[in-house]
Design a protein with these regions (language model features):
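Short, cationic low-complexity segments
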Residues: 207-216
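Short, aromatic/basic amphipathic alpha-helical patches
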Residues: 132-140
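Short "lid" loop at the C-terminus of a central beta-strand within the Rossmann-like core
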Residues: 94, 124-130, 149-152
Length: 216
């Protein structure tokens, strides 16, 4: 769980390790916790050192230090994504924007024999206007739903000034921060985009409710 990771990386035992020593400790840590049938993950990030670390720790099958906001995907990336069924982002929707998603969806669709775009699941902060991405996904034949049952705490505000800035933005969008941002945390919405021909008759709330995600 995330709590396990917070405890691990805040522990005194790891505090003074070099990058190489931490990597040597992380490799067996994650190997011993892998699911019996884990998904194969292709990762991309503009921070090439982060990608190298994830590869070294055994968290990625393939990784690419590329910035799709400023450059086109490499041929190696295009070749790696032919079997991708789900695109997700670990944070930063808003920094990672239309150009990146357009590049990635195009690369996957062109690499797949059926030419179809993959599913997309994201967790942008509530103050992000998601409509431009939803419109982009629609052009790839994807239907987008937003989870309505709950939001997800993302990170604490760094200070009162950041909190006040976000509250003003939310007020301008007509969003109620009570129990969410008012408590000192960014909150994120969950969006799921599916190919129209694969979209379940169940709502996104029903899909994720059955998985237990809404209880986390």
């Amino acid at each position: 769980t995330l709590d396990d990771l917070y405890a691990r990386y805040a522990s005194p035992e790891l505090a003074d390790l070099s990058t190489e020593e931490l990597l040597a400790a992380d490799r067996p840590f994650y190997a011993g916790r892998r699911h019996p049938s884990p998904p194969e993950i292709v990762g991309a990030d503009s921070a090439a050192n982060a990608v190298r670390y994830a590869l070294g720790a055994g968290l990625l099958e393939e990784g690419f230090g590329e910035n799709f906001e400023t450059t086109d995907p490499s041929e190696a990336f295009r070749e790696a994504v032919g079997d991708v069924g789900l695109v997700t982002v670990t944070g930063g929707v808003g920094y990672v924007w239309e150009r990146t998603f357009d590049h990635v969806l195009k690369a996957v669709a062109e690499a797949r024999p059926d030419g179809r775009a993959p599913w997309v699941a994201t967790l942008p902060a509530r103050l992000v206007d998601y409509e431009p991405l939803s419109d982009l996904f629609s052009g790839y034949g994807l239907v987008t739903q937003k989870l309505s049952a709950r939001t997800f705490p993302q990170r604490r505000f760094t200070d009162a000034a950041e909190r006040d800035h976000v509250l003003r933005q939310l007020a301008g969008m007509g969003l109620d921060p009570a129990g969410k941002e008012e408590e000192g945390w960014y909150h994120a919405d969950l969006y799921l985009s599916q190919p129209a021909g694969e979209a379940s008759k169940a709502s996104v709330d029903e899909l994720f409710g059955a998985s237990g995600l809404l209880d986390y």
